[in-house]
Amino acid sequence: IAQDKEVDHLFFTGSTRVGKEVAKYAAENLTPTTLELGGKSPAYITNSASLTKSLQRIILGKMLNAGQTCIAPDYLIVDRKHELNFVETFFKILANLYPEIMENSDYSAIINKERLEHLLQLLEDARDKGGDIYILSEGTVEKLQNKKNISEMTTISGKPERKLTPSLVLNPNFRMNLLNEEIFGPILPVFFVESDTEALNLVEKNQRPLAFYWFGDQKEPRQKWLKNIVAGGVTINDCLLHCVQNDLPFGGVSCSGSGTYHGIWGFENFSHRKSIFKQSRFSAMKSVSPPYTKTKYKLLRMLRFLI
């Protein structure tokens, strides 16, 4: 389709890797594209935010379709003020939202076996590179030790559902594969930071995200973030909701996509404004056409200041 000369406009939703291929093939015919590519969308819980309220909303956004949405929070940055009670609070809220989560029909499966195996590989890689992985096992928060088999601990065994238990990865680092690609699953790396500057530096280590989520009650820091962050869209004190506003454009920037849609922006993006001019019976062009007399030169000089 991308190479079809009859296509007027291509809209693609998917990974950045495939989006580059679509754009490359479309460029052969100069076909315009709109690319919605996802990426690594961060959430930031500031020191002025309520940890409980923020996590309730972040968990809802992350666990929708088991993290398999293009604007799911991909990793979490948390002010160190909240570190002491973070893990306990996270899993308490998770258990309230999804009782007996692995048997809960409200909690989605992973799309296919290959994707599930890839997510398990991300967890093993994170553990091998120094990450602390926490899960909820039979109502108890458990840290996965090196001797534990991650596959046995985190998936339903002997059943076809392909469910993966939500996992926190603490002490993440950029050697881990899960910090170098969109996770697209129920795995949440968590960074604890001392300042807004440290948080912003973390965000800028990754490519420009499709979404950014900021949690807090202080206006001045919020405005500073809105001024400095480069992202496709932002939701303040919640997740995902900027995407469902018909009076806001939705789309990515740089590696998270190009072009916007929704509402009037979608109509204009997918339309071509064809200019049409019909000359009247009498044309003024005769007054400025050769031969150029002194009178015509004066007229042209006058027109130069009017146009």
PLM ranges: what are they?
Residues 1, 23, 66-67, 177-178, ...:
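Short, flexible, glycine/charge-rich loop motifs used to bind or transfer phosphoryl groups or to couple energy/partner
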Residues 9, 15-173, 236, 304-305:
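ALDH superfamily catalytic-core signature
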Residues 7, 153-159, 163-307:
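Conserved C-terminal structural/oligomerization subdomain of aldehyde/semialdehyde dehydrogenase
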Residues 1-8:
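Short intrinsically disordered, low-complexity coil segments enriched in acidic
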Residues 2, 22-25, 88-89, 226-227, ...:
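Short amphipathic alpha-helical segments
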Residues 3, 56, 60, 112, ...:
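Phosphate-coordinating loops and pocket residues in cytosolic domains that bind phosphorylated ligands
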Residues 4, 130, 206:
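Acidic-histidine catalytic/liganding microenvironments
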